[in-house]
């Protein structure tokens, strides 16, 4: 649910905020014992707010420590993020200028650029904070296929409202008002019939059928009535 603390929790791992209580460990080591730069080198973050520069697609994907990576590696990340189709269709390919804050790209394209960045970084920990929130259904299918490969061999934390993006997770954690109210696999949580199962039903089972425009309006009655993983540990 919105406001339950999901993104705040994800922000604690790279130490955008420091936890006031408890301990977060990475491979058994308190994250506060890492040099901040060293800790963040181990983490790739894809958030719902994608920051892009008024520069080429190439320089928006490979920058900072990755600026000297060759085009072959960049294109491999682009392909795995399923961004190659729209990049190849652009007039200058990787050399296309995207405008201020990526104004020339759609929301889904921006998200796939952010995912390509994370793939290129190849960090052992990947945090996806509503990373598919701006994708249409077709784009989401492409990204879901890519994520199966991307998640292999690394710890991945996925923050999601769209439950289709987390059904294959090893552990699903349900938060409410900053507290864990449920955790388990997708099937375990469905079988339990509690919060997760209700959210899942609301998204996938209780979608109203579209109205038939050819169906006549019902006749009014004489008396109308209103119807009623991982590497991270926390302690």
Please name every model-derived segment.
Residues 1-235:
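ABC-type nucleotide-binding domain
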């Amino acid at each position: 649910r919105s406001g339950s603390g999901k993104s705040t929790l994800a922000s604690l791992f790279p130490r955008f905020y420091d936890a006031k209580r408890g301990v977060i460990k990475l491979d058994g080591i308190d994250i506060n014992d890492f040099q901040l730069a060293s800790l963040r080198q181990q983490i790739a973050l894809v958030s719902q707010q994608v920051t892009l520069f008024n520069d080429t697609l190439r320089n928006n994907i490979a920058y900072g420590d990755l600026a000297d990576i060759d085009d072959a590696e960049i294109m491999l990340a682009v392909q795995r993020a399923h961004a190659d189709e729209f990049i190849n269709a652009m007039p200058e390919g990787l050399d296309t200028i995207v405008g201020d804050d990526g104004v020339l790209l759609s929301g889904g394209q921006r998200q796939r650029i952010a995912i390509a960045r994370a793939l290129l970084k190849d960090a052992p920990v990947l945090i996806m904070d509503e990373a598919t929130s701006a994708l249409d259904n077709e784009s989401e299918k492409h990204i879901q296929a890519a994520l199966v490969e991307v998640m292999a061999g690394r710890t991945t934390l996925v923050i999601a409202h769209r439950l289709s993006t987390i059904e294959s997770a090893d552990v699903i954690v349900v938060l409410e008002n900053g507290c864990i109210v449920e955790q388990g696999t997708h099937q375990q949580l469905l079988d339990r019939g509690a919060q997760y199962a209700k959210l899942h039903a609301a998204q996938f089972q209780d979608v109203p059928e579209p109205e038939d425009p050819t169906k006549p309006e019902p006749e009014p009655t004489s008396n109308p009535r209103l119807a009623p993983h991982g590497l991270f540990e926390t302690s």
